[in-house]
Amino acid sequence: MRAFVLTGPGEFAVRDVPEPVAVPGEVVVDVERVGVCGTDLEFFTGDMAYLHQGHACYPMRLGHEWAGRVRAVGAGVDPGWVGRRVMGDTMLGCGSCRRCRRGQQHVCEKREEVGIRGGRAGALAERLAVPAGSLHALPDSVDPELGALVEPGGNALRAARATGAGPGDRVLVLGPGTIGLLVALFVRAAGAEVHLMGATEDSLAFARSLGFPHAWREDTLPDLPFDAVVDATNAVHLPALAQESVEPGGRLVYIGLAAEPSLIDTRALVLKDVTAVGILSASPGLDATIKAYAEKAVDPRPLVAATVALDAIGAVLAGERPAGAGPGPKIHVDPRLM
């Protein structure tokens, strides 16, 4: 089968690789759609921390935001999965440690991460092998495009819920990229007023096109009381800005990761009586995200700018915009395209 293989920083090829096998406890999926993520870009540039911590190494196969149809099942797996449309959890815990037993496999010390950590091959390929226990069934109303948006959506839904926001609340989301916009969509669906802060006029214009009129640059951000602030950026200085912007008694949600340590004055957290929350992984939010998409409470499809073939991934990771791409921040891949 064909797969996108990253062999080093900026070095890649689409290769014929051995077909995955459905070993006991696992399934093989025909991949229909995959999202290209900021994590994939960090592996492409060589900046991803896992490369320097021994959790990942080249060559590797990327892709963790995926949807597809089960092709085959291994021993011990319900054959009823065959033919079903699914997406899968990225985080694969050991299943036996204290964290896994508590349902926190996404922070298991020994976890694998599909297309990211521990050598587990990712979904930028025609087919993918994953544990059956990681599967989440997709209803007919959630098509492949939506299915590949469940994983980032799960992260965003958890961040939105962590704000505790509802009608009458005002929430500031820093960063109108894929995650920030998804957070904004879920917060709006909860009934709160949403403000977004971004760095470029294009990103802010796109946010406004989605029905978010309160879209600002850092130098135009109004002095308003924000009941919660979500930092969905990788900017080192913005965690502190989030802390400054939130109302006393409010909530800070950190879902972005900067390349360098950020500085937060914990005295301000205490004196403002602020609750700060970190969000890692979509795992606990996947089912609720599928439900939200199926019920059309949130429609993230405008975020997808283009869908390309495997052969175009390298150019996308190198920063090229596909011909005819829309204004959204997300690029999808359909491995069936030639």
Label every model-predicted segment.
Residues 64, 94-174:
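NAD(P)H dinucleotide-binding glycine-rich loop of Rossmann-like/cofactor-binding domains
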Residues 81, 142-218:
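Mid-domain Rossmann-like dinucleotide-binding core that forms the NAD(H)/NADP(H) cofactor-binding site
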Residues 163, 170, 195, 201, ...:
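Glycine-rich cofactor phosphate-binding loops and adjacent beta1-alpha1 units
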Residues 255-259, 279-282, 308:
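Short strand-turn motif at the edge of the Rossmann-like AdoMet-binding core
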